[in-house]
Curated annotation (Swiss-Prot):
Name of the protein this chain belongs to: FMN-dependent NADH:quinone oxidoreductase
Residues the entry annotates as binding FMN: 10, 16-18, 96-99, 140-143
Gene transcribed to yield this protein: azoR
Keywords recorded for this protein, A-Z: Flavoprotein, FMN, NAD, Oxidoreductase
EC number(s) reported in the record: 1.6.5.-, 1.7.1.17
Similarity comment text for this entry: Belongs to the azoreductase type 1 family.
Summary of the function given for this chain in its UniProt record: Quinone reductase that provides resistance to thiol-specific stress caused by electrophilic quinones.
Enzyme's top EC category: oxidoreductase
HAMAP family in the cross-refs: Azoreductase_type1
């Protein structure tokens, strides 16, 4: 039995293409892997606090006493990291906003990227500590950006996930959704076909 963690990060709730596709992924996965456990965390509905000068002090090893706000941030960081490490498959619904990921997803990453916990520095360079996972990124875009200089989502997510130890990453693209109903429907259809292929593998 595998455990699947789905991270939603769109601000558009039910209107979101990435949310709809991640819901489709969950439906297909449950159909093919009925014994697996699926956890869904909606980072827009339940936002992660923005990392600031006070909160960053809670995430670094220190003997200094923590403020109540820092204690809350550290407890949330511990919870998010434990959840991440407890799952085998990580599904990230990542819409493109202004060429990059959403603020909601970036805030999540800022709380799970912790030296000595999810990665460490060695004499040979950084080493990821979140290993043995597979990641599937479902990314929706209004325009066409794949393999072009305006796609900052794909390299960023590949780099971040690899940095913490997740190197088996597959991408599902839904592009051109702002080009009209016909293009949006094709984007959804192509993305669902890619999801079907991943789920069946």
């Amino acid at each position: 039995m595998s455990k699947v963690l789905v991270l939603k990060s769109s601000i558009l709730a039910g209107y979101s293409q990435s949310n709809q596709l991640s819901d489709y992924f969950v439906e297909q996965w449950r159909e093919k892997h009925s014994a697996d456990e699926i956890t869904v965390r909606d980072l827009a509905a339940n936002p992660i606090p923005v990392l600031d000068g006070e909160l960053v002090g809670a995430l670094r090893p220190s003997d200094a006493p923590l403020t109540p706000r820092q204690q809350e941030a550290l407890a949330l960081s511990d919870e998010l990291i434990a959840e991440l490490k407890a799952h085998d498959v990580i599904v990230i619904a990542a819409p493109m906003y202004n060429f990059n990921i959403s603020t909601q997803l970036k805030n999540y990453f800022d709380l799970v990227a912790r030296a000595g916990v999810t990665f460490r520095y060695t004499e040979n360079g950084p080493e990821g500590l979140v290993t043995g996972k597979k990641a599937i990124v479902i990314t929706s875009r209004g325009g066409i950006h794949k393999d072009g200089p305006t796609d900052l989502v794909t390299p960023y997510l590949s780099t971040f996930l690899g940095f913490i130890g997740i190197t088996d990453v597959k991408f599902v693209f839904a592009e051109g959704i702002a080009y009209g109903p016909e293009m949006a429907a094709k984007a959804q259809s192509d993305a669902k076909a890619a999801i079907d292929s991943i789920v069946a593998a």
